[in-house]
From Swiss-Prot:
GO MF term set: acylphosphatase activity
Acylphosphatase-like domain segment(s): 6-92
Organism: Natronomonas pharaonis (strain ATCC 35678 / DSM 2160 / CIP 103997 / JCM 8858 / NBRC 14720 / NCIMB 2260 / Gabara) (Halobacterium pharaonis)
Origin superkingdom: Archaea
Protein keywords: Hydrolase
Protein name: Acylphosphatase
Entries under PROSITE patterns matching the protein: ACYLPHOSPHATASE_2, ACYLPHOSPHATASE_3
Length: 92
């Protein structure tokens, strides 16, 4: 499946305590994207998305808005070859 890609994403702003991770998980599952999401100690959210190029790029775009109560300031994404993540989970 050569059309699969991986995006490693860092989201800054008011993104913790606003259901950002849960909304990310739910949206990724709706789009059949594999990966994970977690809060970082510095206040950012880190996520990995794997799936078809179009779906992953769409998910990275979604991160700019995120959950309804979030206030996203920046989204940094790096693309790479997929590592074979299966399913989508919230990591703690």
């Amino acid at each position: 499946m050569s059309d699969r890609i991986r995006a490693h994403v860092y989201v800054s702003g008011r993104v913790q305590g606003v259901y950002y991770r849960a909304n990310t998980r739910d949206t990724a599952r709706e789009r059949d994207i594999d990966g994970w999401v977690r809060n970082l100690d510095d206040g950012r959210v880190e996520a990995v998305f794997e799936g078809p190029r179009e779906a992953v790029e769409s998910m990275v775009g979604w991160c700019h808005t995120g959950s309804p109560k979030a206030r996203v300031e920046s989204v940094d994404a790096a693309y790479d070859d997929p590592e074979g993540v299966d399913g989508f989970e919230i990591r703690r």
